[in-house]
Every structure is written in structure tokens, then in C-alpha cells.
């Protein structure tokens, strides 16, 4: 093993010029006559200079002791200080890299990549040709590219049917009811001549990933969005789902959780449809024409998708927690995927069934505003009765046949190796697989954007550029079934990722409209604001506006539903997701209706309806409605490229720990205020429907409603006292973290000033130019010192800076890991993060303090105190880690 002192020698050893000068001095000393005064000078040098040097060395070692404890990582960064300007050509300052990343992305190139990806079916495990094509393109652009495979348990549709049955004639005296088919659903989407994707022979049938096979018949019950509280409303009204087929509308929560709760309540099958009432007023009822003639939803559009229980665990349901490689043991799946059949249908196919419910059971109006707020088929004769339909008169038959096999999927990885810090890694991911032949928005707009970013970095690499840190680009397979490719990869490389990964950047539905959006952990909020301020907006109302200027600035928490899940919730890696999206319609539904009433019935002033996971998510839709001219694809590539560049090339990691502490204070304050106010204001907001759809869905998706937080509901006075004390301790822990975070951010800001802001094109403080000015920065009197002394001090100063940078960077890098609890969340131990996780009954939306809030929702105050303690311990560990 190399001695640590020896390993440091290349960093502090004198350069060849200083060595030559010393050699000349030695030769001169050996040829000169001894003079008593020279001898005296030598004694003075020994008596004065040597102690000073030794003192400086001792002080330096003492100051570096905290960093020497982490010697491997700090030595790596120390090397950057002497190598940084030598390995980076002057023309490749970060300012020049930025110019390449802004100027290289092309509208036409993005369109070309999107056309390729959407030219044929590419279901998970059925897209090797696209994987190979992606690998080859990335390799052409300079990335070291390869394909990794996993063996996944997947289903594919074999057959399905749906029929509305009505009793024939008078069956009052019959021993067995005779049924006749009143309506048979088509279960297909119309072919549109001007949209070639819809007519492809390899078009994927409508089905649910991980749905169960079955042939079931039963009465129908309308369950609204199928949230936990929707089902609770039915239970309160004594409406049973036992033996029934649940009819739910898409929206609000993850589809698999709609099926999960129906299964728990005894339903034999589930039908899911997209109600146009959720299209923000861009509907036929409001005068908009359906696609392709207008921006409204096509009546036959069907949302495919997975019904895996995503909030329990993503990934292969037979190998939870470990990679699904050939030959590994496989377990039962009942905990992770449904045991009852389900199919997705269009609203055109749902109409006869909804009408068959008319007059049976209560109506949605009897259940409050949440049930009636977005009903879009009233003009078609639907009364939105709940049912059930009379079992002796009206039933539905649902037949679903799925074929399950274990089959390979293929991730593509493209790597730009770091030149100085190769073991610090930034991962950038987009999934490639789609439910349909198209997938223009989801996911292949993101695929096209990533290609443009890889191509842009390739342009820089061809001119000699190399990143400071390693960049790994990933094209995931199997995301649509349950985040399979990314989850299996994270599970396989978990130890390495926990050590090396700095951040994960996700782009899924990269472009679906003109509105920028982001979800991220608070560490990255500042960077998102910074990058969006550097990119021109395509939607400028004032010349010179940036993406940041035209964006609300709201950054949401990360839940689940895309490939960041394994990185953040399982591995504790700082993560961010970025996108341009549509509003689903015209923004606010009332605004869209008003525009239609005034005769403005085109897509010009409203956001066209994006028909998610349908055949109409096509290149033609993107070209005509989603992003005409592909201007937002180019802008998204610029944003993504700069995000990657800052993370991969900024010497001081561009994180802000103080933003995390501020967010945590907000989260704890919310719990405290809810305890104090008993949520009366929230209850009123729910009753009047003044919450946004997103907020309403989050609340309705929880196991209990607003009275959950009413401290008066704690019967045990001691339990109430203990819980309040636990929350107070939690707040104190956040305050301690905030103090340390503020100090770390201040130190990082100071270091950025010292090493130079490379993204502005300046050389860093390690450059060998302008040394006179640098000497003044180190010490005003250093400019008067001998040359050899200045060189020595500068070298020591650079080493000291190196250790400080390493110290700060490592604390930022590992902060997110401190929030992992190895025991995992209750009954879903795969999720380790104590701050963020998908809501157990929402799936998509991010839950804050999930273990704590779920305990409160369950009314288990003892467990709530336990979780408050776990979170407190993790926060204190994080605070200690920032010191």
C-alpha cells in the first residue's frame, strides 16, 4: 500500500525550474570560498527560516487533520488543483462549454430522433433494435456505450372483451337468469388517416401491465377516481363492492392503487376510463373539436398503463430489493401486483355502462363536491349514479387474458469519463419503452432531448473537452411496467452508487406543451432556478425573457411514477426531474369554457389535450399540437445540458443545504399548525372545493381525512403529550440542521469565489497566470517575499483549498444518504427515505415525512412518536455530517 505522505508528494514537490535553481545554488556554494559572513547568513537562515517553515507545515497539518480522516476523497480533489488548468484547454472554460450546450441542440435533429423512436412498437422487452440504435448513436457522439440486460417478469395481452349484459324478458320465475349482450365494447382506438402511427400493424392492444387474467361477471359500481376516500364514502353509504365490477375514472392517484383498494373490498374486476371532465374545459361540450381536427380528446382514446402496486415497491415483482438477473430466486407476486382482472377503456366505451347506472343508487351529488367537480359526460346523458346496477337486471362481463413470461429488457448506458474525479458520478436518465407504437410525449420526447444533450457533449469532447466528473447517460427499458430498468440497475450497483453518485437527473415526458416544470429535492432548487435563468424562453412576451422568467418557479416534491424513484427513495441520491408540459387543456377549466363561448375554439389559446398512453400520443400530434417546430425540444435540451454541465464541471458542488433546512422547517410547521388548528380551515376548503385538483387528490388519497390531525382525537392524554413533545424535538433537530447548513453554504460560497466561477469563463484560482494578484489574495505581504518562498506558499495554499473543497463537496454529496432509514417504511420496507416517498395510497404525489404521516393517518399515535424519533435521529445525523 502506498504511504499517504508519499502519495501527497506529487502535489507538493517543487517544479523542474525550482529544482534547477536549487541545483545551481548548490554548485555555486561548492565553488565559492568560505566567508565568515556567509556562514553567519547560513546560521541565520537555519535559525529563522527553518523554524518558520516547520511552523507553517505543522499548522497546515493540524488544520488538515479533519480532512485527512477522509484522505482518499480529499486527495482526489487535491489533485484537481494542480491538474485542473493543465487538463482543461483554455478555450474550454465552462463558459465555452456553455456556448456549445446552448448552440448545438437543433429543432430538426430532435424531430429526427423523435420520428425514429415513434416509428414502431417498443414495449418493454420488445425494443432491442432501438436499444442498439441508441447505443450506436451515443458511441458515434463520443460516449463509451454499452447495453446491460435484466430478466424481467412481464405480461403481454393475449385476448380481452367487455360486454354489458341485460336480463332478457321476464326472469322472475326462471331458475337461472338469461342474459343478452346489450353492448359490446370495441376496446380499440380509431385509425386516423392523417396520423400514420394509429394505423401501424404492430399497434399495441389496450391492456394493463401486470393485470391479472380472469373472466368475471357482476353488477357495476361507479367509484369516482377510486381514491381511498372515494371507497370510504361508498362504505359509509353501505354500498358494497363484493362481487361487483368497479368502474373508475383515471386521475388523482396511480391506477394500480385504484385496483388494489377495489380488490381489498371484494371487487371481482376493475374498469378504468378517461373522463373528458378532467381535460380542463377543452372538450366537445365546450365547442372544441376532437383530435385530429381540434385540441379536444378523441372519444376512443385509451390510457394503457401498469397496475403494479407502485407505492409498495417498484421493479420486478418477483425480485424485490435485488437485481433480476438470470438464475436468481423469484418470490410470489401477490404483494406487488393485483389478483383481479382490469382493463382500460375509452369514454366512448364507458358511456353505455355509465348510462346503465342511471337511476340506480345515489348520485355523485349525494357525496359532495369532490365527486361532482369534473364530470364531463352529463351532456351525453350520464347522471353519474353510483349503483350498483341490479344484479338480476344489469351486469358486465369482463374477460382478460394475459400471458406472463420472464424475458430480457435492455438498458443503454453512455459514459463520458471524468478526467479528474472519475469516481464522482452524475447519472442522467430517460426511459425508452412505451405502451404504444408512438410515445411521442411519453417517453420519447425525453429520448430525443437526451440524444441532443449527448450529441452536444460529443461536440465538446471532439474538441478536446473532458468533464471533471463522470457523466452516465441512461436509456432505461421497462419503466412503464414499474420502473423496472432503473430499479434493477440501482439494486445491482447500490454500493457503488451510494459511494460515487453525486446526483440523478430524470427526464421522462420531456415535452408535452409550453409550461416548464420541475420536481426536485431542496438541495437542487437553487441550481434549477440558476439554469432556467440561463436559457432563453421560446414563449417570450418581453424580449430577452428566460425560461425562469416565464415559469411560476414552483418546484414540487418527488413522489413516484418515474425513474428517479430508486435513486432517491432507495439509494438516497440527490434527484431532480424536469419537463415541459401542457395544462391538459386550457389551464383553468372555466377559462377554457369562456374562450370556447367567445368563439375561440382552436388550440391557439388553450393547451391541447394530451392523450396519455394512447395511440394518439404520436409524432403527428406532437408536430401539430404538442410542439410545432420542436422549439421546446431544443429548449429542453439546453436546460438539461446546463444542469448536467454544472453538476459535472463545477469544482464546488452546486447544492444549497440551507434550502433543504428551510423546506424541512416548512414541513414540520405544517404538522404543528394542523395539530393546533384541528384542520378546520382545511375541512372548509374540502367542503367548498377550493383546493386544486392536485391537492384534493393528495388529501382524498390518504387513508383518513382532515380530522386525522385533530389532537383531540387522541384519547390518551399522555399519548397526546408525548406526540407534541416528539414534534417539538423534531423541530429542534431541524433547527440544528439549519445552523450547520447555513455555515456549509457560506463556506461553499467563499470557496467558489476563491477557486473562480468557471461557468463565467474565468480560470480558477489554481491557474499559474496572474500569480502576483494571487499572492496578494493569499497575503498582502507575500508579494515582497523571495520567489521560492512565494511558490512554496502558493502550493501549500492550493493544497489547503483542495482539502476544503473536498470537505464541502463530500458533505453535500452524502447529505441525502443521511435521510435513509435502513429498516424502511412500515409495510413497504423497500422505501428507505424518511423525508420523501410516494404516498402509500396516492403513488404519484410525493408524501413528506411518510412514516410519520401514515402513522397519524392510521390513528397509531405510539407509532407516530416512534417515527418522529426516527426522523429526529436522521436529521441529527445529517446535521453532524455537515460539520
Protein language model regions, located:
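Soluble metallo-hydrolase cores and metallopeptidase-like ectodomains found primarily
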Residues: 199-233, 313-439, 455, 459-463
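Short, low-complexity, Lys/Arg-enriched N-terminal segments of secretory-pathway carbohydrate enzymes
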Residues: 1-45
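C-terminal amphipathic alpha-helical interaction region
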Residues: 779-797, 801-883
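Metal-dependent peptidase/peptidase-like ectodomains
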Residues: 299-361, 476-623, 629, 633, ...
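Alpha-helical metal-binding/catalytic segments enriched in His/Glu/Asp
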Residues: 412, 428, 432-483, 488, ...
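Extracellular/luminal Protease-associated
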Residues: 190-326, 330-334, 341, 442, ...
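Noncatalytic luminal/extracellular "stalk/propeptide" segments of secretory-pathway proteins
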Residues: 83-96, 107, 112-241, 299-310
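N-terminal hydrophobic or amphipathic helices/low-complexity stretches enriched
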Residues: 44-54, 60-129, 136, 335-341, ...
Amino acid at each position: 500500500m502506498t504511504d499517504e505522505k508519499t502519495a501527497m508528494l506529487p502535489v507538493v514537490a517543487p517544479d523542474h525550474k525550482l529544482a534547477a535553481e536549487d541545483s545551481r545554488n548548490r554548485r555555486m556554494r561548492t565553488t565559492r570560498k568560505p566567508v565568515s559572513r556567509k556562514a553567519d547568513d547560513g546560521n541565520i537562515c537555519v535559525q529563522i527560516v527553518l523554524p518558520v517553515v516547520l511552523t507553517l507545515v505543522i499548522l497546515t497539518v493540524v488544520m488538515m487533520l479533519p480532512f485527512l480522516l477522509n484522505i482518499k476523497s480529499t486527495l482526489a480533489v487535491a489533485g484537481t488543483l494542480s491538474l485542473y488548468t493543465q487538463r482543461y484547454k483554455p478555450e474550454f472554460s465552462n463558459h465555452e462549454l456553455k456556448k456549445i450546450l446552448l448552440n448545438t441542440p437543433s429543432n430538426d435533429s430532435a424531430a429526427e430522433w423523435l420520428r425514429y423512436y415513434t416509428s414502431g412498437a417498443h414495449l418493454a422487452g420488445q425494443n432491442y433494435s432501438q436499444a442498439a440504435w441508441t447505443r450506436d448513436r451515443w458511441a458515434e457522439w463520443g460516449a463509451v456505450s454499452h447495453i446491460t440486460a435484466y430478466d424481467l417478469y412481464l405480461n403481454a395481452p393475449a385476448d380481452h372483451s367487455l360486454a354489458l349484459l341485460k336480463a332478457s324478458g321476464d326472469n322472475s320465475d326462471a331458475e337461472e337468469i338469461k342474459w343478452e349482450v346489450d353492448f359490446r365494447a370495441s376496446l380499440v382506438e380509431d385509425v386516423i388517416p392523417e396520423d400514420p402511427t394509429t394505423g401501424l400493424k404492430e399497434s399495441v392492444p389496450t391492456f394493463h401491465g401486470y393485470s391479472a387474467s380472469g373472466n368475471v361477471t357482476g353488477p357495476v359500481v361507479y367509484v369516482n377516481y377510486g381514491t381511498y376516500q372515494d371507497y370510504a364514502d361508498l362504505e359509509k353509504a353501505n354500498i358494497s363492492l363484493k362481487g361487483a365490477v368497479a368502474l373508475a375514472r383515471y386521475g388523482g392517484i396511480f391506477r394500480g392503487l385504484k385496483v388494489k383498494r377495489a380488490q381489498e373490498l371484494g371487487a371481482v374486476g376493475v374498469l378504468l376510463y378517461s373522463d373528458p371532465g378532467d381535460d380542463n374545459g377543452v372538450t366537445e361540450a365546450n365547442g372544441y373539436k376532437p383530435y385530429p381536427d381540434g385540441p379536444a380528446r378523441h372519444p376512443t382514446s385509451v390510457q394503457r398503463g401498469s397496475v403494479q402496486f407502485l407505492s409498495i415497491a417498484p421493479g420486478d415483482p418477483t425480485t424485490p430489493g435485488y437485481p433480476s438477473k438470470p438464475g436468481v430466486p423469484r418470490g410470489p407476486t401477490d404483494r406487488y401486483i393485483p389478483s383481479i382482472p382490469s382493463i382500460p377503456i375509452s369514454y366512448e366505451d364507458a358511456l353505455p355502462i355509465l348510462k346503465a347506472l342511471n337511476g340506480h343508487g345515489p348520485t355523485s351529488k349525494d357525496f359532495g363536491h369532490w365527486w361532482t367537480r369534473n364530470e364531463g359526460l352529463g351532456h351525453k346523458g350520464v347522471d353519474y349514479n353510483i349503483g350498483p346496477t341490479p344484479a338480476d337486471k344489469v351486469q358486465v362481463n369482463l374477460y382478460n387474458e394475459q400471458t406472463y413470461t420472464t424475458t430480457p429488457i435492455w438498458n443503454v448506458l453512455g459514459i463520458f469519463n471524468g478526467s479528474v474525479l472519475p469516481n464522482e458520478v452524475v447519472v442522467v436518465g430517460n426511459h425508452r419503452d412505451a405502451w404504444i407504437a408512438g410515445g411521442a410525449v411519453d417517453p420519447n420526447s425525453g429520448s430525443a432531448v437526451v440524444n441532443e444533450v449527448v450529441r452536444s457533449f460529443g461536440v465538446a469532447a471532439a474538441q478536446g473537452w473532458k468533464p471533471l466528473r463522470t457523466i452516465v447517460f441512461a436509456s432505461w427499458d421497462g419503466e412503464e411496467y414499474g420502473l423496472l430498468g432503473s430499479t434493477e440497475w440501482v439494486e445491482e450497483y447500490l454500493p457503488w452508487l451510494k459511494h460515487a453518485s453525486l446526483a440523478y437527473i430524470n427526464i421522462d415526458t420531456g415535452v408535452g406543451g409550453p409550461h416548464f416544470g420541475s420536481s426536485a429535492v431542496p438541495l437542487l432548487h437553487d441550481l434549477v432556478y440558476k439554469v432556467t435563468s440561463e436559457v432563453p424562453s421560446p414563449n417570450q412576451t418581453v424580449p430577452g425573457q428566460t425560461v425562469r422568467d416565464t415559469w411560476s418557479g414552483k418546484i414540487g416534491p418527488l413522489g413516484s411514477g418515474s425513474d428517479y424513484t430508486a435513486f432517491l427513495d432507495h439509494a438516497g441520491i440527490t434527484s431532480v426531474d424536469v419537463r415541459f408540459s401542457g395544462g391538459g387543456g386550457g389551464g383553468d377549466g372555466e377559462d377554457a369554457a369562456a374562450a370556447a363561448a367567445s368563439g375561440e375554439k382552436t388550440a391557439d389559446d388553450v393547451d391541447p389535450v394530451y392523450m396519455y398512453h394512447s395511440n394518439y400520443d404520436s409524432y403527428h400530434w406532437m408536430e401539430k399540437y404538442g410542439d410545432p417546430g420542436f422549439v421546446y425540444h431544443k429548449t429542453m435540451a439546453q436546460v438539461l445540458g446546463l444542469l448536467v454541465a454544472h453538476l459535472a464541471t463545477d469544482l464546488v458542488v452546486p447544492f444549497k443545504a440551507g434550502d433543504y433546512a428551510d423546506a424541512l422547517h416548512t414541513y414540520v410547521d405544517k404538522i404543528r399548525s394542523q395539530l393546533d388548528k384541528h384542520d378546520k380551515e382545511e375541512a372548509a376548503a374540502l367542503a367548498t372545493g377550493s383546493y386544486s385538483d392536485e391537492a384534493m387528490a393528495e388529501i382524498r388519497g390518504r387513508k383518513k381525512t382532515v380530522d386525522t390531525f385533530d389532537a383531540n382525537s387522541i384519547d390518551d392524554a399522555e399519548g397526546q403529550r408525548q406526540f407534541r413533545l416528539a414534534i417539538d424535538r423534531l423541530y429542534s433537530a431541524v433547527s440544528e440542521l439549519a445552523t450547520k447548513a447555513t455555515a456549509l453554504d457560506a463556506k461553499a460560497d467563499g470557496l467558489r469565489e476563491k477557486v473562480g466561477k468557471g461557468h463565467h469563463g474565468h480560470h480558477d484560482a489554481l491557474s499559474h497566470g496572474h500569480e502576483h494578484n494571487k499572492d496578494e489574495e493569499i497575503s498582502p505581504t507575500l508579494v515582497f517575499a523571495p520567489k521560492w518562498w512565494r511558490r512554496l506558499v502558493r502550493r501549500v495554499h492550493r493544497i489547503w483549498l483542495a482539502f476544503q473543497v473536498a470537505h464541502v463537496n463530500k458533505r453535500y454529496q452524502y447529505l441525502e444518504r443521511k435521510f435513509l432509514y435502513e429498516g424502511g417504511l412500515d409495510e413497504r420496507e423497500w422505501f428507505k427515505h424518511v423525508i420523501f416517498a410516494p404516498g402509500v395510497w396516492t403513488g404519484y404525489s410525493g408524501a413528506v415525512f411518510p412514516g410519520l404521516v401514515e402513522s397519524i393517518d392510521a390513528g397509531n399515535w405510539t407509532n407516530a412518536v416512534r417515527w418522529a424519533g426516527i426522523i429526529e435521529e436522521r436529521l441529527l445525523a445529517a446535521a453532524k455530517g455537515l460539520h
